[in-house]
Amino acid sequence: MKRVTGIGGIFLKAQDPKALGAWYEKHLGVDVQDWGGAQFFFKDDESPREQGYTVWSLFKEDTTHFAPSTKPFMVNYRVADLHALLAALRAEGCEVDEKVQDDEYGKFGWVMDPEGNKVELWQPPTGG
């Protein structure tokens, strides 16, 4: 029997859910609904035969990958143009990590949200 077939949702604790939802809507374009969440539908019209993917992974308790956040999680969001988004976030006054990682898995950048959550932004490699 197959059990988990994908990630159905990511849930975050927030000190002020409305304000944090507004931040994600303004700066990252997340369409936050009245019920307090958003739904993402994955379909690639340009390459319908190619399959996109979402990664779920466990890190050791002492990882520094989430730093400077002290939270026990990090959310990764797919983006179309990492460098353009990072530039826009900087212009909007967001706390953007200067480091950008570019490897066979794509391009990665990071921003901190107002509650200290490190947000990973990922531009998949071509065909990913």
How should each PLM-predicted stretch be described?
Residues 56, 73, 92-94:
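Short intrinsically disordered coil segments
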Residues 1-15, 35, 62-128:
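Vicinal oxygen chelate
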Residues 45, 57-66:
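A solvent-exposed interaction/effector surface
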Residues 2-5, 11-55, 91:
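Core segments of cupin and vicinal oxygen chelate
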Residues 41, 57-59, 122:
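Residues in well-ordered beta-strands of folded domains
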